């Protein structure tokens, strides 16, 4: 999942940059949305990992 979130962020950066260079506001907005989605996935994955680690420590 980490790779997926990083890819979404990268894809968003590319779309946003291309949209900015070509003055395509719709593509630029799509890129911004992709970046937010990628960052949200990353935050959820990090939280999931921390919770899993905490549960594992409690089991020991």
UniProtKB/Swiss-Prot annotation:
Entry's family note: Belongs to the UPF0337 (CsbD) family.
Protein name per the record: UPF0337 protein SAUSA300_1582
Top-level taxon of origin: Bacteria
PANTHER family given in the database record: UPF0337 PROTEIN YJBJ
TM annotation in the entry: none
InterPro entries found in the cross-reference section: CsbD, UPF0337_stress_rsp, YjbJ_sf
SUPFAM superfamilies for the chain: Hypothetical protein YjbJ
Gene3D superfamilies: YjbJ
